[in-house]
């Protein structure tokens, strides 16, 4: 994983009251708590989830 492209994603807004599909995207990225940061592979699938809930996230990479 050290040579694969990754993206750092941080959940900055609450999932309370959000659409179930948006909550599922956050869970799919491995995010459970506010201010939790995870590093995910830069794949089209992960990029799609990041784009869908970009208003809840801060990401770099």
From Swiss-Prot:
GO molecular function, one term: structural constituent of ribosome
UniProt keywords, alphabetically: Ribonucleoprotein, Ribosomal protein
Alphabetical list of SUPFAM superfamilies matching this protein: Ribosomal protein L30p/L7e
Transmembrane spans: none
GO biological process, one term: translation
GO cellular component, one term: cytosolic large ribosomal subunit
Matching Pfam families: Ribosomal_L30
NCBIfam families documented for this protein: rpmD_bact
Subunit structure: Part of the 50S ribosomal subunit.
UniProt record similarity statement: Belongs to the universal ribosomal protein uL30 family.
Protein name: Large ribosomal subunit protein uL30
Organism taxonomic ancestry: Bacteria, Pseudomonadati, Pseudomonadota, Betaproteobacteria, Neisseriales
The encoding gene: rpmD
